[in-house]
Amino acid sequence: MHGRRHLAASLARALTYAPSRSISSTPSLLQTLDPSTPSPAAAPPTAGRLAELRQRLQADAPSLGDFTYSVEVGTRKKPLPKPKWMKETIPGGAKYAGIKAKLRELKLHTVCEEARCPNLGECWSGGETGTATATIMILGDTCTRGCRFCNVKTSRTPPPPDPDEPSNVAQAIASWGLEYIVITSVDRDDLPDQGSGHFAETVQKLKVLKPEMLIEALVPDFRGDPACVEKVATSGLHVFAHNIETVEELQRNVRDHRANFKQSIDVLKLAKEYAPAGTLTKTSIMLGCGETPDQVISTTEKVRAAGVDVMTFGQYMRPSKRHMPVSEYVTPEAFERYRSLGVDMGFRYVASGPMVRSSYKAGEFYIKAMIEADRAKATTAI
């Protein structure tokens, strides 16, 4: 009995006074106290397993950007609850299912899914207007930038673009029976032409297969390179879109450091200069990022001064906890005031509402009508 008490006391002292001792050393300690304890067989990992483990840890580890984005400034402890007007509808319908199946078959990506757009089902099925639309994302699914609002994955060195993607995208879109398509892309700062050639080729191939389809290109800023802007603007599209994302004062808080307000405005001006007559330019901003009404008005005035034809306002929705928080949920009444203000400023069309996104079915329905009206006028003039 005395021997057992002595053994227990020795074990307690060893565990209490040697907290730095690793778990792997416990068997040898037990053997010292009780020689009858069997020794486990050593099984050191192979070099290959170690290399694989390092790769997995590196892939799963949070980046500095993840850490930065997860830090919320201010005293709010809980995210704002969603108001009743932000209810989302469940995607569905035969056309929705058909488009989704074709996307999986050809391994294509849509920003509708990547960005978790709440209007996905409505746009793909055609909704009330009957104008079914979709937004295809080309140049891969990995962006070279890391904006604080965006859910698309990022990397400094994404995989190279698929050379067959322009043909695959054109064939898929031509088979869907859509009337209006939005083609967008991730930023590709790693490519010499920022991906503009790939973009233009996709538009051109689609025009060959389905010349009557209306095409909107929602492009990155191409780092402001005029040659890249010209390449896409003259590719045969009907709408050249580039989003400024937020008001001028919040650009550095919301967007990647390589993007800025002046560069985006210059891209929209260049597009208007290079594109054929009748091509519309378009941009969009999110509300609920911390902007003031005066900042929204000032930014909208500068966008209109750049000759932009179409503008949309929508509510920022936080994709995950590592993204910037929602500052406020802007009311439908406020969105309507911004819409009315934009119309008064001279925009040809303004879409404004909590669920509006830059690529939005209802907006595309009206843009389609505008383009067709312009075509009719041009035909009459001839």
Swiss-Prot record:
Binds 2 [4Fe-4S] clusters per subunit. One cluster is coordinated with 3 cysteines and an exchangeable S-adenosyl-L-methionine. It catalyses: [[Fe-S] cluster scaffold protein carrying a second [4Fe-4S](2+) cluster] + N(6)-octanoyl-L-lysyl-[protein] + 2 oxidized [2Fe-2S]-[ferredoxin] + 2 S-adenosyl-L-methionine + 4 H(+) = [[Fe-S] cluster scaffold protein] + N(6)-[(R)-dihydrolipoyl]-L-lysyl-[protein] + 4 Fe(3+) + 2 hydrogen sulfide + 2 5'-deoxyadenosine + 2 L-methionine + 2 reduced [2Fe-2S]-[ferredoxin]. Its main location: mitochondrion. Its cofactor is [4Fe-4S] cluster. It is an enzyme of class 2 (transferase). It is found in: Mitochondrion. It holds the Pfam family Radical_SAM. Gene3D superfamilies: Aldolase class I (3.20.20.70). Pathway: Protein modification; protein lipoylation via endogenous pathway; protein N(6)-(lipoyl)lysine from octanoyl-[acyl-carrier-protein]: step 2/2. CDD domains: Radical_SAM. PANTHER family: LIPOYL SYNTHASE (PTHR10949), LIPOYL SYNTHASE, MITOCHONDRIAL (PTHR10949:SF0). This is Lipoyl synthase, mitochondrial. It comes from Oryza sativa subsp. japonica (Rice). The lineage of its organism: Eukaryota, Viridiplantae, Streptophyta, Embryophyta, Tracheophyta.
